[in-house]
């Protein structure tokens, strides 16, 4: 995370969003202490999930690393609001998505393996505790059914980023147009193809300098 942040700062970024729950819980405090630009983290939306759950049974789909992290457990203790919070580690799911196999039968079978037991437990709210998981949100919705509300973190993170940019007078003028650039520690044509598939339009992938 530090390596990536240094690369981005060298390119002139004015804020960084750590768009990864696992990296946020493991590295955000250290990174904030080392850089002088705003760092926004991503954490599972436990608070709104617990607040809106009627059955008071909430589940979080998370990576193995996030599920074992103490900061993550502390967030649950802080925000559960009397709800029972079930944690479901999802080994293998990120790998399917990063390989461009998120629509495969094998990926769908893995999702069923993780989600069906949660439905049987009576949850009515499901938190996507990894920023990869919205890429399979449609499949998750089909498996979970209409009775389960699915929550992910993109919207609140966008609101928080906008708020910080405005507060620190770092927001762009209305005349300025942004641009998208894509960098990866693994820069190959296959990766570029997968990135384009996930982004839903062709893109050029650049390598992060060593």
Task: For the regions a language model picked out, list residue spans one by one.
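Non-catalytic structural scaffold of enzyme domains
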Residues: 1-210
